[in-house]
Amino acid sequence: MTEKEKKLWGGRFQENASSILERIGQSISFDHKLYKEDIQGSIAHARMLKQIGILNSEELSKIEIALAQIKTELEEGKFEFKSELEDIHMHIEFRLTELIGETGKKLHTARSRNDQVTQDVRLYILNQGKEILKSIINLRSSLYQKAKQSLDVIIPGYTHLQIAQPIRASQYLLSWFWALERDQEFFRFAFKASEELALGSGAMAGVNYPTDREFLKKELGLSKVSPNSMDGVSSRDHILEFLFACTQLMIHVSRICEDIILYSSQEFGILKLPDSLTTGSSIMPQKKNPDIAELIRGKSGRVIGNLNHLLVMLKGLPSTYNRDLQEDKLALFDSIETVQISLEGIREMIEGWIWIPERAEVSLKNGFATATDLADFLVNEKKIPFRTAHELVGTLVGVCVKQKKTLFDLPESDRVSISKYFVGKEYEDAVSLSLSADKKISYGGTSKKRQEEQLKIALDSLKEAERLFL
């Protein structure tokens, strides 16, 4: 077989493809990942062709057996790739024809690579997306377990990267638990676009055969059939929506990594990462670097970039299919791999880190973290207007800063000079770190009672997710 004859479109051309066309047009270096989905779609298509009389039972059996052999060859590393065959779809069809001859050439009846490729990608998103969902649920499970263990650990809560108020560590961990629940639901929503059957749309106008697309939908386990063949082959909304979900997830993961980097630094020091998840320096022997967190933070930019790449590529394309769309898979494949390894890395860090509560206590005291509690004490117990209370406590903090003291060790005489209420057990209770968190009794707050309540709700949410996806 000559090179020209190997091309699926070779009949029209009198010259072989140039070297640069081969090099710039090949996609087998990355779209080989679609082999399972391509074979899955081809088997469904072959069964449909049998339904409408294009194939007989013997031919269908030959095709199914040969496709199963090709799948085995690919998985065992015995499949021979040829640079002139461009992509995984041509490779599989060429090998099929090698195995069963003319019968193999019938498989592409009523099918274009345009609808074939977009269908493969939709199936790939569904298959890989389920794995990402499992990883999200596993990460949520790790956050839940860590939160349960951290219920009695008090750490600083921050706004503007400055110490704000004491919180239970469980409150912090559960804040990411709920963010990841939204990511989980975003992926579920994104899957809907991939659950639409594109196969049967042909090149773009439909096909000249009485194909049974409802049959194909059921064979592939999809939920609906694309109502318009032009939209079916040209839309990449299924990839866009999936990458939007990946991007939101990676933004959350990157922010967790930023917290880990900060909180494990000498300046903060409220958590410690295990040695196995950190690295040293080639010149500075004292260093213990949170490389995994930094690398994941960096990888988040790649996923955001992949989404932007696809958005820019799509914005100026005319209807319907254009070869530019070959580039969509690079963005998709890279995002999937990046998300998966990032979820693994962040999970190990969460499971492995240790809180350092004594350092957290020092930070809370030095950061005047219970100043708001003191103001609320004046409002609730002494019936002082909040703005007046705010001013009194602000003055107290100013004196502490000037004298390099805290709310706990500033002499009573200095406190009384500001307010007669800044004395005795009432004052001590008002600024107490241990009591502060339990004063936050509003729903969703950081009091122990509300945290126990939230842990129960979180467990119910986790069980429901595991029931649906694991």
Curated annotation (Swiss-Prot):
EC number(s) on file: 4.3.2.1
Major subcellular site: cytoplasm
Keywords, ordered alphabetically: Amino-acid biosynthesis, Arginine biosynthesis, Cytoplasm, Lyase
Annotated InterPro entries: Arg_succ_lyase_C (IPR029419), Argininosuccinate_lyase (IPR009049), Fumarase/histidase_N (IPR024083), Fumarate_lyase_CS (IPR020557), Fumarate_lyase_fam (IPR000362), Fumarate_lyase_N (IPR022761), L-Aspartase-like (IPR008948)
Catalytic activity: 2-(N(omega)-L-arginino)succinate = fumarate + L-arginine
Keyword Cytoplasm listed: yes
Gene3D superfamilies recorded: Fumarase/aspartase (C-terminal domain) (1.10.40.30), Fumarase/aspartase (Central domain) (1.20.200.10), Fumarase/aspartase (N-terminal domain) (1.10.275.10)
Pathway(s) annotated for this protein in UniProt: Amino-acid biosynthesis; L-arginine biosynthesis; L-arginine from L-ornithine and carbamoyl phosphate: step 3/3
Gene Ontology annotations of biological process type: arginine biosynthetic process via ornithine; L-arginine biosynthetic process
Pfam families given in the database record: ASL_C2 (PF14698), Lyase_1 (PF00206)
GO cellular component labels: cytosol
Subcellular location: Cytoplasm
Gene Ontology terms for molecular function: argininosuccinate lyase activity
Keyword Plastid: no
PROSITE patterns: FUMARATE_LYASES
Annotated family: Belongs to the lyase 1 family. Argininosuccinate lyase subfamily.
HAMAP family: Arg_succ_lyase (MF_00006)
Protein name per the record: Argininosuccinate lyase
Biological source species: Leptospira interrogans serogroup Icterohaemorrhagiae serovar Lai (strain 56601)
